Amino acid sequence: PNVVGLYKPAGGAAWNAPTVDPARGAIYVGTGDATTAPPAKTTDAIMAIDINSGKLLWSYQATENDVFMGGCNGPNRSEACPSPMGPDMDIGNSPILTTLPSGKRALLGGTKSADVFALDPDNNGALLFRMNAAGGPTGGGRGGRGSIVWGGAADAEHVYYGAGAAGLAAIRPTTGERAWVFQPQGRGVALGAAPTVIPGVVFQGGSNGMLYAVSAADGKQLWEFDTSQDFETVNRMVAHG
């Protein structure tokens, strides 16, 4: 008899804007975790999709068997909750496509465990390196010091990721080594926002309301600005923070 599947894999949401690669006629998108078991191979992944046909070209899965539902991490779990619960390692950031000094290209993404991986977009997404921006082991869970959620930035020398409590990390895309780490003063300050880079300067927002300007060469702080203050708006009303 014919068998009809009533339920198929769910999850793998795309949190982020896709990255366009005109040279290969492809777009790249990061995906989240699965919400049903067994998880699809395209969850917690970067997917390359043909820009003309919409067909999948290749996919790199950063975390396997990650089935997670936000309403299931409390004491009252329903029968619909996955067991065991996965580590919740979504790739929430847009992939970064950059060209190395050698002319070779690299596609980078980050996970909630602060893992950063580089793929070869010209070789079916072959893994170039995988490292941890927080300085810990790769493949860990969210119990570590750092987490990458919202995105990074790149220039000719480095790729930059705000790794939460682990600070702002500059990574050499040729080797996967950390060039420097900026950690602001004060306890419990997380740098989770996506940084912005211009020639010579990286801008990074903090959970303490501070905006930091950091030297792209060595990670030294250039200045800081406290956004938690009163501002006069365009209609002369005063707003705070």
Question: Model-predicted segments: where are they?
Answer:
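Generic short beta-strand segments
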Residues: 32-33
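Extracytoplasmic/lumenal domain signature
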Residues: 1-9, 21-27, 36-91, 96-241
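Long, compositionally biased, intrinsically disordered segments
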Residues: 13-14
